[in-house]
Structure formats: structure tokens, C-alpha cells
Amino acid sequence: MKQRNSAILSYGRTIRKATANDVSLIMDFIRQGRAKMIAAGNVNQWSDKHPSRQTIEKDIAQGTSYLLCENDTPIATFALLAGPEPTYSYIEGGRWLDDQPYYVIHRVASVEGVHGVVSDIIAYCLSLTSTIRIDTHADNYPMQAVLKRSGFNYCGIIYLEDGSQRQAYQLSL
């Protein structure tokens, strides 16, 4: 992935690829993220088994796992994968904005008490691509609000491999 232009992140924040040494830290971010979702009433999006350590290790091995750092200290994680995303091939109740090549953001999680994480992740991703797709659970109201504020368009419902529904969004510049 070649950077198209510089990402403008919040002051003191940078993005770096995750390494095998970061797995435990990322799993801690995921535990904190799961707890935040449950506290906000979203008990269904991430089960105790998802995302798994194996998934995170695979993301790292494939070079798709990233850390958002503040003053060189990791504060959040996400995966950025080149499309096509297999579960995005069928969309119900709507349609994708276009058929252009895209990247997908998955597995966003952060430490407790930090703000602007998703906005910084989106800014970074837009330095690499002009089209981003993302999905989230219907009960994940905070993520839906951030996506709408960031200019994403709701496109419809997609189904994960296990049959779970997710709301699908796309941003195309």
C-alpha cells in the first residue's frame, strides 16, 4: 500500500504497523473495546471469541494490523485490508456507492478514555485510498455516529460468514 498523501492526524499521533510483539497489547485493546460496547448496550457485536488472538496474529502476519500511537504510545488498533471483502459481495436493502477498488477497516479498538481515534484512523486510510468500506453492528451507535460525521454513507445490510447482520457504510472521495 503506497501512501497517496500525508495523513493529518491529531497532534502527537502517528500510525505504525503492528508486530508480533504487539499481540498482547492489541488483545487488551479488544478486551477494553468489548467492555465499552457492552456498557453502551452493544452486547452482540464482539463475542468472547471474536476477534480472536489467531485473527490478530494473522492480521499482523499479513501486514494489515496497525496501531494508532500518541507520543509513541499505542492507544488504538485497527486492521486495514484491500478489497474485495467476500462478505460484501451481497448487500441487502441498498447498494454500494460504486464498484471502485476499496479498502476495508476492521477490528477498531482503543484504550479507555481516548477520543478522536476513528477520525484519525479514517484520515490515515484516506491517505492510502479514496474509497473505504466498513461495517458495524446495528447496536453500535457510537461507531455509526462517527461514520456519519466522517462522511460515510449507509449502504445496506451485509452478512458475516456466521450469518450475523452488519450495517455497511462506504466513503468515496
Locations of the language-model features?
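Conserved GNAT acetyl-CoA-binding A-motif
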Residues: 128-139
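Conserved catalytic-core motifs of GNAT/GCN5-like acyltransferases
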Residues: 135, 153-167
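Conserved acetyl-CoA-binding loop-helix of GNAT-fold acetyltransferases
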Residues: 110-127, 145-149
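A short beta-loop-alpha structural element at the N-terminal edge
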Residues: 13-28
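Conserved acyl-donor/pantetheine-binding loop and adjacent beta-alpha core of acyl/acetyltransferases
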Residues: 79-113
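Conserved active-site alpha-helix within GNAT-family acetyltransferase domains
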Residues: 139-156
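Conserved GNAT-fold acetyl-CoA-binding loop/helix
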Residues: 35-54
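Conserved beta-strand in the GNAT
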Residues: 67, 73-83
